[in-house]
Amino acid sequence: MTILLRVLFIVASAALLAALLLLAGLLYEWIGGGVDRRKLMKPGRLVGIGEGRQLYMVERGPRGRGPAVIFESGFGATSLNWLHIQTALAERVHTVAYDRCGLGWSSACTSERTPRHVARELRELLRAAGIEPPWVLVGHSFGGLVMQRFALECAEEMAALILIDPMRPVEWPPFNAGADGRVRRAQRLTRVGGVFARVGITRLAARSHFCRSARFSGFLIRLAGRQGEFLAQRLDTEIGKMPAEVRPSIAAHWSAPRFYRGLLAHLEAVEATALEMHEAEAIGDVPVTVLTPASAAPPANMDQYGPRGRHMIAERSLHWIHLDEPELVVQTILNAVAQAVAEDRRAQPMVAAVD
């Protein structure tokens, strides 16, 4: 009986300790999330787009000096990706970067994360924020497909389209069966991250990795095995190219349970995204610039970008061209804005003559 009581006591104590740790983790995440929102959201603002949804956006530069430049990020990325580009353009161009539903500081997503749905949410944001056309749209990776869809649906409001190594539908399921396993592994890893995020473990890891000694995050990375180490290395490589002041915000985003729900929604829509954009029609009379790294094959079908499409190679870049060669992206944007302004001026006398 004495042995049984001891066993029961040990089990009960372990269960109580586990419950207390779980409660502490939940409380840590709840408090940390609130502190993050109060401290880190200041550069931008939340804009309502209907049905209770809000999108977080950051504006830089003066309005009214030519077309506004609108940025769209890749998978899992937010407006932070464009901060250095916005800063470089701030004195000459009006720019807007934002977080898609499900990512960053924006509301949870309520629709499938395909280019069509995301482009419509962006259109609602621009309308609600009073960002008038014409626009120069800039999209990276998945964001390139979003901006391509936007250009197809709102061609008359476009000034130019700049695609930075856009996602290629033929490289993803269902067209590339070999990528299916990679997508499924990413989904599983994201689900695990979401569980850890709810109890504060991801917050500890993110703070450790981005803002402190990285000992705790290093332990978790080793625990995740080869895939975790590969992912961490890629993140370090790309995030290391971003301004140091954004790291607390990156840590905050990667700490939040809603981030993993949003990222999972994007991953679950990969096949639908590939199908939608593989069958997309060609863009009309809009200037389109496609930037790809030298290590990538050129676009297989430039016809999809219309009669004014052109291809440029970023010689010193990998996939994240706007981080590897920001000066190239800045100059490409300035050229597009200048061309749009010049074309608008040439059109004005023609409009007056018709009137």
What spans do the regions from the language model cover?
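N-terminal membrane-anchoring alpha-helices
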Residues: 1-45
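N-terminal signal-anchor transmembrane helix
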Residues: 30-67, 80, 84
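Gly/Ala-rich beta-loop-alpha elbow adjacent to hydrolase catalytic centers
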Residues: 139, 143, 147
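Conserved HGGG/HGGXW glycine-rich cap/lid loop of the alpha/beta-hydrolase fold
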Residues: 59-105, 145
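The conserved beta1-alpha1 loop
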Residues: 70-74, 140, 165
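Catalytic active-site module of serine/aspartate enzymes centered on a nucleophile-bearing elbow/loop
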Residues: 4, 307-355
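Flexible "cap/lid" subdomain of the alpha/beta-hydrolase fold that forms the substrate-access gate
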Residues: 115, 158, 162-309
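Active-site loop/oxyanion-hole signature of alpha/beta-hydrolase fold enzymes
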Residues: 51, 58-60, 97-138, 154, ...
